Amino acid sequence: MNGTQFIARILKEEGVEQMTCFPSNALIEEVSKEGIRPVMFRHERGAVMAADGYARSGGGEGFGTVMMQHAAGAENSVGGLSQAFGDNVPMLVLPGGYPLAERNIRPNFAA
């Protein structure tokens, strides 16, 4: 079992039924295999706003879940995330990433 499979399984066990996303994240295929419905968006902020709406419409049950690509994708989502944070909307945000070995910066450091 790798990291994405592990995360997908935990999300399923926690009751996640759908996840909004921008189509550039390795987790998308794994959540699909677990029976979680990925809902694709053309922009990260739209995906965040949909997850926000999903959480708000649940009547206090559950939370919104959104994933996007790293770097610019995470930056594009900040406006929607700020609004959700300001309104205390429960949301899980999973920005993607890439292996440290692919950064081409030696030595590789991780905080």
What are these regions (language model features)?
Residues 1-111:
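N-terminal alpha/beta PP-like core and its mobile active-site loop of ThDP/TPP-dependent enzymes
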